[in-house]
């Protein structure tokens, strides 16, 4: 048994891909018999049915929104440094074998611990977030893992280290196919014969939802009985709402507040397909994999690590060039017109995720990267 800690100030205060990865890996490692600790900021976010082998420690921090805006990276570094100032003594007292860092902004952790601390550090990459000085600080990172092959190349280009690829995962028992929820559709005002596309995630520019709105207004989609459900919040939401009005799409686009991660499967049960038109390099795309695990066909951008999730052979979903509203509209029309194809793609996507991308598999790969014994046995 190993003592493993995850350090991420955001994991107890917000939802997102990195936060999901931390909680799910913590759960998989705890079920495998390891002693797990999670160090986050003061906040109440926890997964439902937290495994008893996981201890959560929270500490005060200065939220990035309260830091002078001289750059988002500066704000996030200050946010994490303020958390470390309060958390480091409790962390050092834990005598952990390994600590997992999720952002380069935390690379200073090995440098601020008491002399003689034996904890080794692993960087679990899910993107880039590089900053001046990170190469120097990275010298005390002992192990490197990445969310995809694409992400591994990004990390190697920056730090000249080759990470082990562990991939992210999906809770396939939770994100499972279900009977279409017409009650939820009725609550949303969606007719039974309407093809409902959906996106769930943070509304930031690089997610490309402006492209999805423009695709819906393309000639190929104007005479199709479709609607787009956008679930989430973020700085781009007002801009997207304004674009919806400008394009005359107010009757075809629904904005929904963010939902807890545990309620996402029910939401996917009400939709016909997922649309994820990223215009920035996503390392993996957990939300895409979750939709696929629910047997939903997906349309996503051919960018970053997304093709590793969806596959290139068009059996599980369709890949389109990033920032191409016309190509996205054609793909949406293709799925809207072919319900049988939607079913086939959904079933193939579910099989792909179950075969390649579960959290138990991710945990086994992480343990191997740390040089620890992997035990696939499920521990109650």
Task: For the regions a language model picked out, list residue spans one by one.
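Conserved acidic donor-binding segment of nucleotide-sugar-dependent glycosyltransferases
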Residues: 312-325, 334-340
